[in-house]
C-alpha cells in the first residue's frame, strides 16, 4: 500500500459552508445526508459558556457603567487588531486519488471507511486532548471528494490580572496546555501543537496499517487545492 498524506491546513472559518446552509459546486447533494455532525453550537452560546462568568465578574468590579463590557464576542469582532473570534482546521487523510469517498458504483470505498474511523476517533478525542480549545463546531464531510473534518474552536486562556480573568488568546491557550513559548516564526506554539496533532493522527493511521508520508510542517499552513476552490466560491456567494 502506498503511503498516504495527512493534511491539517488552517481554514478561513466559513461556518455557513461547513453547516451546509448553502451548497457549493464541489458538493454532491445526494450524499450530504452522509455527513456526520459531532457538534454544532451557535458561536454566541459558546462564548457565553466560555466567557460569560468572567464577563460578569469583571463588570461587578467596575463602578462606572461606561467601563463595563456588554458583549465580549462583539468586542473581539469589532477590535482593530485582527483578533479572531474562533479558529478552524481541516483534517484529511489521503487524497481523492487514494481515498475517494465512493467508487464507480457510488458505494463507500474501503479506504474511505478506514479514513472515517480515524477521523471520528480524532474528533471524539479532540476536546480531551485540548482542554483550552473549546470545540463548538465539528463536522465530517462525506459529500465531497475525500472524507475530511472541519473543526472549529475557541481558545481559552485563564489567569489575567487586569480586565477579564478569562479571555480569548490562542498563544496563551497553547502555553497553558504545556507548549513552550515561541523562539521564532518556525518554532512557536502553533507549530508545536500542529506537530503533536499530526503525530496523533499518524499513530491512528499506523494502527490501521496505513503508512504516512511526511511532508513537513509548512504544508499545514497551506490550504488544500480543493478547499481553496471551495472557499473562493463561498467568498463570492457571501459578498
Where are these regions (language model features)?
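N-terminal nicking endonuclease/strand-transfer module with a His-rich metal-binding environment
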Residues: 1-239
Amino acid at each position: 500500500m502506498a503511503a498516504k498524506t495527512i493534511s491539517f491546513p488552517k481554514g478561513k472559518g466559513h461556518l455557513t459552508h461547513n453547516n451546509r446552509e448553502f451548497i457549493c459546486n464541489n458538493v454532491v447533494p445526494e450524499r450530504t445526508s452522509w455527513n456526520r455532525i459531532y457538534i454544532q453550537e451557535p458561536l454566541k452560546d459558546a462564548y457565553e459558556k466560555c466567557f460569560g462568568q468572567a464577563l460578569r465578574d469583571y463588570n461587578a468590579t467596575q463602578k462606572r457603567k461606561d467601563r463595563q463590557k456588554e458583549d465580549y464576542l462583539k468586542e473581539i469582532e469589532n477590535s482593530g487588531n485582527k483578533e479572531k473570534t474562533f479558529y478552524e482546521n481541516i483534517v484529511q487523510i489521503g487524497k481523492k486519488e487514494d481515498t475517494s469517498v465512493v467508487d464507480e458504483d457510488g458505494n463507500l470505498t474501503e479506504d474511505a471507511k478506514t479514513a472515517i474511523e480515524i477521523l471520528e476517533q480524532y474528533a471524539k478525542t479532540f476536546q480531551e486532548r485540548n482542554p483550552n480549545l473549546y470545540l463548538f463546531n465539528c463536522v465530517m464531510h462525506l459529500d465531497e471528494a475525500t472524507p475530511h473534518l472541519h473543526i472549529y474552536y475557541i481558545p481559552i486562556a485563564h489567569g489575567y490580572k487586569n480586565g477579564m480573568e478569562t479571555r480569548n488568546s490562542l498563544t496563551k491557550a497553547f502555553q497553558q496546555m504545556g507548549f513552550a513559548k515561541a523562539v521564532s516564526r518556525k518554532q512557536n506554539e502553533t507549530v508545536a501543537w500542529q506537530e503533536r496533532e499530526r503525530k496523533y493522527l499518524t499513530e491512528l493511521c499506523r494502527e490501521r496499517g496505513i503508512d504516512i508520508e511526511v511532508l513537513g510542517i509548512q504544508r499545514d499552513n497551506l490550504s488544500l487545492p480543493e478547499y481553496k476552490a471551495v472557499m473562493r466560491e463561498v467568498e463570492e456567494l457571501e459578498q
